Structures are given as C-alpha cells and as structure tokens.
Amino acid sequence: MRQMDKSAIIDTLQEQGGFITTGEVKSRGEYEQLRRAAEAGTVMRLRKGIYAECSALANNMIDVERIVPHGILCLYSAFAYYGLSTQVPSATCVAIEAKRKVRLPDYPPIDLYYWKKENLEFGIISRNISGYDVRITDIERTVCDAVKYRNKIGLDVCGEVIDSYLKKEDRNISLLHEYALSLIHI
C-alpha cells in the first residue's frame, strides 16, 4: 500500500511538472503521501508548502514562479539563456521588488537581486524554458543590465555580453537605447 501511495504522489508531481504546493493537494490522504515521500527522500521539501520531485531538480532550470512568486530571471541566468556569455551561472539569478522579503530553499541555489519597482516594469517577457513558464528580461534589457551592473559582474563578462549581442542578426539597437535611457532615470 505504501509503495502505491508513493507512486500516486509521484504521478501527480510529474503531471504538475515536478513541483507541487500543499494548496494543490486535494485531500489529507494525499498530503500524508507527500509527507511520507519527503521523509523517504523521493520528494524534496523546498520550503514550507512547496515540494519537488528529486529528478525535476536535476534539470538546470527551475520553476521560478513557484519558488519566488513574481520573480524575474535576470543577469547570469539571462546571459546563459540568450547565449550572451560563456559563464555558467552557479545559481539561478532572480530579480524581485526591493521591498519584498522572500524565504529561499536550501536547494536549488538562487541569487536574489532587489530592484526598484520601476525596474521591473519594462523589458520583461514570458518564455517557456524547459517546460516552465518563466518571466525573464528580454535580450536588450539583459544587455543594459550587464552594463548597469558591470562592476558587480566584471568588465570581462560585460564586454562578452555586449560583443555577443552585437553579433546577433536580430538585435534591436533602438530598443536597447530606449532601455538604457530608462535605466539612467531610475
């Protein structure tokens, strides 16, 4: 019976893309199955109310919206997504509003960047990455962020991002200029 319980909760997790919240659990019995699966190590508790199937965590992309609601992939994670840098991010880079407080799980590693609300209102798009709907800075905004945070990320990374962007055929220099002006005034 216990093996069947574990299998049922794993099936539910797989249907949900590897992640589940206690709010999505339909009954006390399912909650107990989830708790037992976490105790057995089949499922990992990321933080209070959020669980993930261990194999889902092996993927290099995470369901950012579940772990950091309203978070936006940025900087190194965006550089990697757009192929602007050869740097491999050691953690998922997520921007949130400066006044927010977020409790992060031990795993997966996430670096939070606290941005002013005005910074979160432009240059943000939604993409389906590895099966997850993720909000991410668009490519022009990503390049502007590289320049803005050049002292934090390093001039070598900033230069690599700019060079890679300028080699792209689909670049939009006028949008890049518009974003640069917006970031100057924030």
What does each model-found stretch correspond to?
Residues 86-89, 153-155, 171-172:
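Short, structured loop/turn "capping" segments at alpha-beta junctions
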